[in-house]
Amino acid sequence: DYEIHREDVKALRCKDEVDLLLKFLDLWRRVDPDILTGWNTTFFDTPYLVNRITQLLGEKMAKELSPWKLIFKEEKEVQGRTQVSAKIVGVSSLDYLDLYKKFTYTQQESYRLDHIGYVELGEKKIDYSEYGTLQTLYVENHQKFIEYNIKDVELVVNIDAKMKLIDMALALAYDAKVNYEDVYTQVRMWDVLIHNYLWKEGIAVSPKRFKGKDSQYVGAYVKEPQVGKHDWVMSFDLNSLYPHLIMQYNISPETFIDDTPYSLSIDDLINAKPVEIPQDKVLAANGQCFRRDIHGFLPQMMQRMYDDRVIAKKAMLEAEGKLQEETDPQRKKQLENEISKYKNLQLAKKVQLNSAYGALGNEYFRFFDIRQATAITMGGQLSIRWIERKVNEYLNRILNTQEIDYVIASDTDSLYITFDRLVQSVFKKGVSPGSNDSQRVINFLDRVAKEKLEPFIDKSYQELADYMNAYDQKMQMKREVIADRGIWTAKKRYILNVHDSEGVRYKEPKLKMMGIEAVKSSTPEICRTAIKDALKIVMMGKEHELQEFVLDFRKTFTSASFEQVAFPRGVSSIHKYRDSASLYRKSTPIHVRGSLVYNNEITRRKLTQKYEEINEGEKIKFCYLKMPNPVKENVLSVPNYLPPELGISDYIDYDKQFDKAFLEPMKVILDTIEWEAERTASLESFFG
């Protein structure tokens, strides 16, 4: 029996599973859903539901789920495992797990609902670890089993209430005039967008012809950074780079001139080597030319989408402003709905714009041409390297220096520039990050960006457009962050102590990180938090303060649980590395070896009824172990938590875990500023 403790829950008693399924089908018919969602519904809930109805009520009854009485099953290889899905024709499937992976643009250590609920809401699933498996929970505590399932539904509902990914998917689908499921695929969505756009213009789209991708094309430019510490850094970003490159160079299938390209290297173009370009042609960065006498349909579509997004974003911000002052409850509700509508519309336009290049660079796209794809990527390289040269020339001239590289790093559409020399020349007494004069410097740099750098950048990009005989000048670069300190360790690996981001001034500086273990999902959460805290000391404190922090954190770390200190990983190729004689083969990756050890142990100890084995494609956590120990290996992986029956809690190699999860990532950063994470004994201190 189930006792109801909440007004928003209704329980319907069923005499058996057949009765339950019949009542469910009756409810399904009355609701008549258009969309089915949940967490991993594609490969679990939907096929399970279809299979149970088929087995107990027959295939004909299972087909009642579909308004067209059609259900198609499909097998798919996912991370080494064969997964079966069931397509209920007439009911769209928007698996929230897929929506989250597609539209959040962040890598998580796990995509289990338990973890995502904690990340997004600070809530977790109901813990049933004392029962081992859901089957045991179902048999021994039916009340908790029902509450567990209710909580699962609530987590998905609350995540969507916060993120509104279903609303965004619907906005994308309606705007592009595609089926809901098509929002996952850039190629199909853009194929329909272009088809409808040209159809309105009275143009029939050519048949799809797949030629194959005969070679790779160049990607974005990433400068080798100036490794180390840099003070007073500003970053400048190009706005929607690839869509604007398509607009600037009029890149489109019907404007492409199929002729021998100009034999100019990217360095020739960066240094503005003289070149004669006919007035009716646009020169792209890969030497290809595009017509200038007509406006291509792709640039027109990009411009309209961009303009629509600007309008929607402006309407959203206006509604948000009105909401702050509104007191009438009914009007407030209307404004909230307006905000939601315009937010989803502008996000849909943003997704469409950003996915355009992804479609153009896909060999299965109707309009794919490697020369046009290369024109876009090399155009991006030219834009960022052109402005790097110009900014360096400008700052060397202003500061009366010669050939000093003020651009610390650049990445696809961003420049990171040090203004330390400028700051020290203006603030004669000298000013350092974290000092009382910091805000004066931030204000000064903000004015420098607005009044000097941005106008100079606009002028420089106009020179580039004129040089290439561009259809239009579309490169817009604005200041993003102002940081009093930054540290680079390698390409795409940096930390910035940000005081101002796009005009938003912080009361306390915030760390912006890329490629650092503190933002990597493969680092234990306890270490991610500690690395962030340690980096704040690196940015604003002293070496001895950091060493005290590390000493305290080591104590915290060594008292933490297996699950807290273990490395999160995704596991694959378990079957490939399994060996019947020795359990695992030579050169087996450490986390896969740990998974094989775990599976072997729960089988050997007859625990498979209580604990599930680790399967292909699952997320696991692994820890190094001290030897000797009960499992006779120096590593163990677990799917969720460590079974106490294995008896290895006392054998966790905390020192090795601490070194690999915390000290080694910190050392990469600290080496660049010549700091030590821990105090080291010297001869002087040894002899007093």
Features from the language model and the residues they span:
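Active-site-proximal helix-loop-helix substrate-binding element of RNase H-like nuclease domains
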Residues: I4-A11, T46, Q55, E59-V153
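Proline-aspartate-enriched helix->loop->beta-strand connector
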Residues: F24-L49
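Mobile, glycine- and charge-enriched loop segments
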Residues: D1-F24
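Short beta-strand
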Residues: Y406-D411, N469-A470
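Common nucleic-acid-contacting/processivity interface regions adjacent to the catalytic cores
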Residues: G132-P253, D259, Q330-E393, A409, ...
